[in-house]
Amino acid sequence: MPKPRSDRNHIIYEIVTPVGSYIGVTAKTQTTVLKSLRARAAKHYYRARTETKTWALCQYLRTLEDKSEIDIRMHEMVRGKADAHARERELIRRYNPALNTDKRGA
């Protein structure tokens, strides 16, 4: 019997704002893609509110009244963490989103 897969699906997503966009990657940890994306958006929102990061995304999220105002969209699903992060870097290089301030590997 073959060994079960140990890698998981990852979602490459985009947060769209009036001041630009942000491209990121997250593991599909919930039962649906939408639930996983909402959980990731909530985590971004929480960190922006509780930490003092000066990242462009955090600064934008601090202007929102509620996490439900975050417009998060799926770009694609990728199997495996390494492949997902490599694809995220490709998309960041291609689109140069304004809110991605960490350009390592881009």
Give the location of each predicted region.
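Serine endopeptidase catalytic core focused on the charge-relay Asp
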Residues: 91
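Coupling/hinge elements of helicase-like and P-loop NTPase modules
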Residues: 95-106
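Conserved short loop/helix modules at catalytic or binding sites
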Residues: 27-81
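GIY-YIG nuclease catalytic motif and its immediate N-terminal context
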Residues: 1-36, 71, 79-82, 86
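Sequence-level detector for tyrosine residue identity
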Residues: 13, 22, 45-46, 60, ...
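Small/flexible residues
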Residues: 7-10, 51, 75, 105-106
